[in-house]
Each structure stands twice: as structure tokens, then as C-alpha cells.
Amino acid sequence: MNSVEFLPLDRITPNSVISTTSNDLSNWSRLSSLWPLLYGTSCCFIEFASLIGSRFDFDRYGLVPRSSPRQADLILTAGTVTMKMAPSLVRLYEQMPEPKYVIAMGACTITGGMFSTDSYSTVRGVDKLIPVDVYLPGCPPKPEAVIDAITKLRKKISWEIYEDRIQSQRKNRYFTIKHKFRVGRRIHTGNYNQGLLSKSPSISEIPPEKFFKYRSSVSSHEFVN
């Protein structure tokens, strides 16, 4: 009968056993295989499209662009989001499986950009619709900045606990696809009372309730969830 010979342990020989936890293994697998859903609506998406080329080669990060939200765990919102597009964006986000992440790319996505001052149809920040993990400012951001944002997201994934994230998302579900306009409370119109202005030389001495006059026929429209 042949005897079994055990080779002596050599320090040069690498260890074949790796000790880890299921949470760390899950985080490592998710950060190494992010599948983004491309949601480009403006010029910022052109900068992101350059990452697919050989110069930046974002495939080395395990990024595989998907066209279906049910196969993606990351959505990059690049460009202006309007009121009509808001329900579609929220619907795409809700169709993504858990855990899922969001990168807001560009000034128009984060704050509305140059359309935030006098546009009646622009959403002032995509975080009013869906929770955002990484904000990437710029007009537009460079491809190097996009890679840096993905790197920061990977670092965030490596430190998170899966159960805590699921509970936090269920608790903070402030987004919905039922975005409608409704008639809100009545407010003052801001019209000046010419009678008070002609009598008193000092405007600061007039109480606000007397300075403005109310009109019952005017009401405001509020964008609500």
C-alpha cells in the first residue's frame, strides 16, 4: 500500500484558502460587474459615449451597457429631465432589480442647469425623483471625471451592507410615477396697492398684509408627487 506523503509547507507557495464574509464577497462581485442603463437626453451623454472607445476602455471596470432596466443595476442620467420625462425615468428606476445605484451626470441633471431659472418644464434636480448616489457636476463632465465617479461608486459599494441599503431604500421611497399638476392654495398676486404707495413715502413702514391685495380668482399650480 502506497503511503501518502505530505509535502512540507513552503512560505513561497501561495495560500489556497481565502477567508472572507458573504457581505464582502457580494460587494466585490457587484462593484466588479456594474451594468449601467444609459439614460442620455442631452450633450452630456456624448462625453459618456466616448468612454466606450479604445482610448478610455471602460470595459476594464466590468461595465456592460444594457438597454433593459431589468438587466441593469446602475443608471446614469445625463442631460435635462423635463416634467413629461419624469414619470418614465421613475418607472425605469423602479424596474431595476435591487441593489441599484444612480449617478447624476452634468449640471442640467443635478440642478436643472441653465434651464432652472425661467423654464416651466424642467425638473430642478433628478434627486427630486429618484435617490442619487454620486453627483458629477460639469457642463459637460469630461470622460476622466466619469471614470472618477464610477471609482467613487465602487468604493462606496465595497463598504456598504446589503441589508442596511435595502431597508434604507424601502424607508425612503419618496419617489413615485404619479406626477400630476393640481390646483394648490390661493396666494397673493404681488400687485401693488397704488393707494398706499401714493399716500406714504416710506414703503418699509407699511405692513405686508396691507401692502399686497388678494385676488380669489388666481391660484398656483404645484408639482407634487
Swiss-Prot record:
Essential cofactor(s): [4Fe-4S] cluster
Domain of life: Eukaryota
Any one GO MF annotation of this record: 4 iron, 4 sulfur cluster binding
Stretches that traverse the bilayer: none
CC annotations in GO: chloroplast thylakoid membrane; respiratory chain complex I
Positions bound to [4Fe-4S] cluster: C43, C44, C108, C139
Major site of localization recorded for this protein: plastid
GO terms, biological process: aerobic respiration; electron transport coupled proton transport; photosynthesis, light reaction
Membrane-topology descriptor: Peripheral membrane protein
EC number: 7.1.1.-
Cited InterPro entries: NADH_UbQ_OxRdtase-like_20kDa (IPR006137), NADH_UQ_OxRdtase_20Kd_su (IPR006138)
Keyword terms, alphabetized: 4Fe-4S, Chloroplast, Iron, Iron-sulfur, Membrane, Metal-binding, NAD, NADP, Plastid, Plastoquinone, Quinone, Thylakoid, Translocase, Transport
Catalytic activity: a plastoquinone + NADH + (n+1) H(+)(in) = a plastoquinol + NAD(+) + n H(+)(out); a plastoquinone + NADPH + (n+1) H(+)(in) = a plastoquinol + NADP(+) + n H(+)(out)
Localisation per UniProt entry: Plastid, Chloroplast thylakoid membrane
Cofactor annotation remark: Binds 1 [4Fe-4S] cluster.
Major enzyme class: translocase
Keyword GTP-binding attributed: no
Pfam families assigned to the protein according to its UniProt record, in alphabetical order: Oxidored_q6
Family: Belongs to the complex I 20 kDa subunit family.
NCBIfam families according to UniProt: nuoB_fam (TIGR01957), PRK06411.1 (NF005012)
Subunit record text: NDH is composed of at least 16 different subunits, 5 of which are encoded in the nucleus.
Described function: NDH shuttles electrons from NAD(P)H:plastoquinone, via FMN and iron-sulfur (Fe-S) centers, to quinones in the photosynthetic chain and possibly in a chloroplast respiratory chain. The immediate electron acceptor for the enzyme in this species is believed to be plastoquinone. Couples the redox reaction to proton translocation, and thus conserves the redox energy in a proton gradient.
Record-given protein name: NAD(P)H-quinone oxidoreductase subunit K, chloroplastic
